[in-house]
Amino acid sequence: MTIRKIYQIAFFIAFLLPGKSNGQISQGGIPIQINKQKSASFTTDLVVMPAIDNLKMRDKYSRTDQNMLKQFHFAHSFDVSLSPNNSGKWYNTSEVNVWQIRIRSTGAYSLNLILHKFRLPDGARLFLIGSNTGEIKGAYTSANNSDSQVLAIEPVSGDELLVQYEEPVGVSFRGEFLIAKVAHDFVGITGDGVHRPLGISGSCNKNVNCDLANGDESIRDAVCRIIIEGTEICSGSMINNTALDGIPYILTASHCIGSEIQAESSVFLFNYEMPYCSPNNPSTDGDIKRSLSGSSLKALFDSINFALVRLNNIPPYNYRPYLIGWNRINTAPAYSSCIHHPLGDIKKVSIDWLPAQTGTFSSGYQPNGFWKILKWDIGVTEPGSSGGPLFDQNKQLVGALTGGSATCNLPTNDYFLKFALAWDYRKETGKQLKAWLDPLNSGASKLTGMYLYSGKMLCKPVTNFKDNDTHAAIQITNGLTKKGYYSGSNLVGFTEFAEQYKFSKNCEVQGVSLGIAKVKTNPLNASSLIGVQVYSGVNQPETLLYTEKFVINRFYNDAMNYISFQTPV
């Protein structure tokens, strides 16, 4: 078999190929910098939320979460009503009108917003910018318009953010949106920077890409982290149906998404994981850019604790969307595994090598309606794991997490809803899975999974890291003199760095994830670019296949940063 070897020039914080950026870039664009002396309308652009005591809020939810359900409360939501018609400031030019408002909730680790009545014309752009970090979310455009007119946005680090709306002169209609909720993070879901602090979930948890999870690559790609109404975190998974038509259904727990408004106000984050195991060096976070906002509720039944929603948008091909296969036969799996996001952390895997038992979760729930894990052999589940899929020995879904008492100190007694019972225990289409996952009425008891873009010959993720490898920013030294970094800014003339990846068959490379230690640049300066090149070759880079430049200030420190090529290679 021919081996195709792809070489890519890695990112360097040496500002490879510096230059000016023009127009739209692949990471979503750069907000316009405006002359603030051209302001009009309102007298203030700062709105401050009522004070919150983070410690008291954490204590409150740690007590309310003692019912064994495993959603993760991390934020308090304020109801507001802020729009370009009643708040903020407008800045007008001959080509574009720009509206800004600043929102502060003192002491928040991060802020997130939920927008209602969201309807933008073509050409308009909306950004959220962290006032302290320069983190940029957006641009949100007419592509984010939906029937629900709801847009939920991932958290922005820090206790103050700037909302900036840009509308070209002469658009077909005036854009509309209402900031309806501001959520104050009292836990630290993004830590002190823009990313979640690692090591917060239990130390017994294992990264999903450790060698012990070999063979789980496909089902791993189906699992997502869900932020519901800006305040809670759960897990969920994309699931296949017998029509094989690629409808993006997500299965989770009903105590996570329990209503249509919660479905509409949810954010689904895919591929939030480490690309390697890193058991002894958990200092690099996963990529947080591949998310989708909004869904519609299709089916729910509380006493079995399942919810099925349909995403408003089909995940793009570079999300690697996989639709999990399932087994609805009510037979205990010989052994079980669960992939989930404990405490909102990067994706983890838990394994029980013994057969699951039938059990009852608690009063108010269907008797004997759950798979009981007596004891985890590897990892556990935690708050934030609710809704995470349970797989049998054939990697088919047989349940989803409701809750339990398992901890790293005592990894016992977790409960997963039975997929077999959720299938058609109730006959109403809004309270069963059968109507949605077997639209052909085929009577199938099992279904295999599939990648949503199976015909595109996409390359599978590859890495050169092994389980026990570590990483560090290595300085170049000459005696006592420090001359910079091997893969960053330096005084010895290193301007490029190559890494070799091997693929067993011809396939499309869609992008690359880069571990960035630190970036220093003006958050709104669009002039600093860095280049990525893809080569083919045998023992060294030989034939240039692709090159693209990226704006440096869109990268996150101490984290994996996924960049998508505008044209797959």
Where are the language model's segments positioned?
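Protease-domain processing segments flanking chymotrypsin-fold serine proteases, especially trypsin-like
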Residues: 24-99, 147-154, 159-240, 454-464, ...
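C-terminal subregion of chymotrypsin/trypsin-like serine protease catalytic domains
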Residues: 250, 278-291, 298-300, 308, ...
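Beta-sheet-rich sandwich/jelly-roll-like modules and their strand-loop junctions
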Residues: 455-539
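Catalytic nucleophile loop of clan PA
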Residues: 237-247, 379-402
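Short, surface-exposed beta-strand/strand-loop-strand elements in extracellular ectodomains
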Residues: 120-134, 526-537
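Bacterial Sec-dependent N-terminal signal peptides
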Residues: 1-28, 459
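Aromatic- and Gly/Pro-enriched, solvent-exposed loop/edge beta-strand patches characteristic
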Residues: 378-382, 387, 518-569
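Serine endopeptidase catalytic core focused on the charge-relay Asp
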Residues: 156-374
